Structures are given as structure tokens and as C-alpha cells.
Design a protein with these regions (language model features):
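A short N-terminal helical cap/helix-turn-helix that marks the beginning
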Residues: 1-23, 42
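ANL superfamily adenylate-forming
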Residues: 29, 119-180, 289-361
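Conserved ATP-dependent adenylate/AMP-binding module captured primarily in the ANL superfamily
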Residues: 93-123, 211-229, 259-274, 367-368
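Conserved AMP-binding/adenylation subdomain of ANL enzymes
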Residues: 209-227, 234-333, 343-362
Length: 392
């Protein structure tokens, strides 16, 4: 198969050309800027053409040291489109860890988010055997300078040179994309290194394509024009795969922060329909709720009682609607009896659940209303029970 992630993006650009693909903030701004699909693809082509200008070849490794942002995805798609392999890492990595990953992956090009990450890399420049170029993303100046055998330049400079190369070679990136295969290595993601030196995990294009081809039937909520808020690191395969999934369906990705006040303000501002999360985010909300109700013994007992009722109600409802996994198909009689039993349980417990909603959970719902109205939410199962109860 000659199917790759960049090919999938190329196929949908015309379809969603005028829709927003990214919503992002610049600097200390509190307002969101937008980028449409057509402009996104033009920037991808300029980045790829800029890399071709600097002599990158198929199969070379490109390190991306950055937190989640729109440029991350642009660099990723440009790199993969050229048949290269990207090696992502977050800004919290140490100098020694970065040097090890750069050398171990045999990377020749590096993208760093800002000057702080640049200094980390340069502190180990004498140990970097193969590095030829370093690109600084967060720099509004256009510059290029030499430091020994390493060329350092800004993202802005890369775009300028890429635009020139693209005008002279308008088909070069398209030609490289068509050379790609689903069997090509797309990325090398290194483990955290908590039990020793980080280990590189290689993923092919087909690893991502497999997910893209199977998830849409189960997620009908993913539709063009909707907004997904992003708070997880893109250098983790989970967030990266999820962003591919939604972006290829015309959903805008809004970059926020996993910080309570920032996230809640962005929810109010954007009114997103989707979020990809981990239990820790919702655990913070849960702890805040528990802390508040624990101020009084009566509040604590009432809350705890109604929460247990809500969890039982949610489980009964889940089984009745067929959302729970069934490992052995029951016979018809047992299936009918089971549904009847669940239905009676739901009817009996509903008045108590409704009372809890009126007396307790209505007040909790109000500040969380935007979050609880999400159409698509991925978190740990036991935490979702609390959210299901609040939403029902």
C-alpha cells in the first residue's frame, strides 16, 4: 500500500479548504487566532520546501523539541511528506536526555520551540555527531548563522527560503509525497526514561492509518466545523493520533493548557464540542468538588450518598442501552429478563437520582456546564461515572 498520513491530509485539503484547522494564541494574547486548511497546507509545503533547500534526504531523522502548537503538526506533516522520520520530545527534557535521543536516533535536523530549548541543545553541541541544522520556531526574526558545522536559523527564515524553493520547484513536495509507503517509518517516540535510558519506539504510517480507517464508524460526533480543545502533549502518540483523526474530518483544533483557570476560560470563549484528556485532569476537578463538600459532615454524607446512587443509575443505564461489553451472548429468555430487570431498576432509582440532581448536583453543574456539554470526551472509566451522573 502506498498510503501515508500526508497523503490523507492532501486528499482532504480541497474539501475543507475554507474551514478552520487551528485555533491558537500568540505570545501573551488571550484571544485566539485561526488558520484555515488551505493556509495550513501552504505552510506545510513551504516548510517541506525549506528543508529540501537545506538538503534533507528521504529517511533522515528530524527531532522536534516542542510542546503542543500548530507548528508542531505542520512540521510533522512536512517531515513525513518528505519520507523522513520525526523524533518528538517535550520541553521538559534535560540536556543529557536530548543529546542521547538526538544521537541514538541519528538525527540530522532539529526543530526547537524557543531559545531555552536551543541553549539546551547547544550545551551538548560537541557531542552531537550528525546534526546539520537547527530551526528555532518561536522567533519572529529572519536569520541564519553558522556555529561550526551546524546551521542555526529561524522558522521564519525557513518559510521564506521554502517559498522561494517552492516557486522554483512547484511539484517537488507532491512528488515526494507520492513516493511514500504505508510501510515507511513515520516516527520514533522515546519512552520517559524513568527506568533507564529512553527507548525508541518506531511506528509506521500504517499504524496511524489503521486507526483512521476504523474509528470513524464509532465516533459519529466527529464532523466538519466542530472544535476540539487540545491540552495533551503532541509528542505522545495518543494525542497525536487523535489530532490526525479529527483534523482529517474537518474539525478545528484549539490549543489550550491543562491549567484549570486557563482551560475553563478557553471553554467559555470557544464552546468546544470535543476534548481528548486523561484521568488526571478530571481528578483535579473531582478533588476540588470533594474538598468543597467535605467542609461540612452533613454535606459530605449527602453528597456521598447521592453520588453512589448516581453511579448505580449510570451503570444500570449503560447496561440497558447496550454500552457494556458482552463476552458471551445470552439466550433470548435471559436477554429479555435482564432488560426487564434493568428497566425496573432504572425506574425505581430515578426519583432518588433526580432528587440528588436538584439538591446537590445542580449547583456543581453550573460552573462546569461548558465541559459537561461536550459531545466527545475521552477519560478514565471510573471518573467518567461522576461526569455521566452530572450530565444525566
Amino acid at each position: 500500500m502506498r498510503d501515508t498520513v500526508p497523503k490523507r491530509f492532501k486528499e482532504v485539503i480541497t474539501l475543507y479548504s475554507e474551514l478552520d484547522i487551528f485555533m491558537y494564541k500568540e505570545g501573551d494574547s488571550k484571544s485566539f487566532k485561526k488558520q484555515i486548511y488551505a493556509d495550513f497546507w501552504n505552510e506545510v509545503k513551504r516548510v517541506a520546501s525549506g528543508l529540501l533547500h537545506y538538503g534533507i534526504k528521504r529517511g533522515e531523522k528530524v527531532v522536534i523539541i516542542s510542546d503542543s502548537r500548530r507548528e508542531w503538526v505542520i512540521i510533522d506533516i512536512a517531515t513525513l511528506g518528505l519520507g523522513c522520520v520525526d523524533v518528538p520530545r517535550g520541553n521538559d527534557s534535560s540536556e543529557d536526555e536530548l543529546a542521547y535521543i538526538i544521537n541514538h536516533s541519528e538525527s540530522t535536523f532539529i526543530f526547537v520551540e524557543n531559545n531555552k530549548q536551543l541553549q539546551k541543545v547547544l550545551s551538548k553541541k560537541h557531542d552531537l555527531r550528525l546534526v546539520k541544522c537547527i530551526v528555532v520556531i518561536d522567533d519572529d526574526k529572519s536569520y541564519e548563522e553558522k556555529m561550526g558545522i551546524i546551521t542555526i536559523f529561524s522558522y521564519k527564515k525557513l518559510l521564506e527560503l521554502g517559498a522561494e524553493h517552492l516557486r522554483a520547484n512547484p511539484k517537488s513536495f507532491d512528488i515526494e509525497i507520492e513516493k511514500g509507503s504505508s510501510k515507511d517509518i513515520a516516527t520514533i517516540i522515546y519512552t520517559s526514561g524513568t527506568t533507564g535510558m529512553p527507548k525508541g519506539v518506531m511506528l509506521r504510517h500504517e499504524s496511524f492509518i489503521f486507526q483512521l480507517d476504523r474509528l470513524y464508524d464509532y465516533l459519529p460526533e466527529i464532523k466538519p466545523g466542530k472544535i476540539m480543545i487540545s491540552i495533551l502533549p503532541l509528542w505522545h502518540s495518543f494525542e497525536r493520533a487523535c489530532e490526525y483523526i479529527v483534523a482529517l474530518k474537518g474539525v478545528a483544533i484549539a490549543y489550550s493548557k491543562p491549567i484549570g483557570p486557563v482551560l475553563l476560560k478557553d471553554f467559555l470563549l470557544l464552546n468546544p464540542q470535543m476534548i481528548i484528556s486523561v484521568p488526571r485532569i478530571w481528578e483535579g476537578i473531582r478533588i476540588g468538588i470533594i474538598k468543597k463538600v467535605s467542609e461540612s459532615l452533613i454535606k459530605k454524607l449527602v453528597f456521598g450518598g447521592f453520588l453512589k446512587v448516581g453511579i448505580i443509575y449510570a451503570k444500570l443505564n449503560e447496561k440497558f442501552l447496550g454500552f457494556s461489553p458482552v463476552y458471551k451472548k445470552p439466550n433470548l429468555f435471559i436477554s429479555i429478563f435482564s432488560k426487564l430487570f434493568l428497566f425496573i431498576g432504572i425506574i425505581l432509582i430515578f426519583p432518588i437520582k433526580l432528587l440528588g440532581d436538584i439538591l446537590v448536583f445542580k449547583k456543581i453543574k453550573m460552573p462546569l456546564d461548558k465541559i459537561l456539554n461536550l459531545e466527545f470526551l475521552v477519560v478514565g472509566r471510573w471518573l467518567i461515572m461522576l461526569i455521566i451522573f452530572l450530565r444525566l
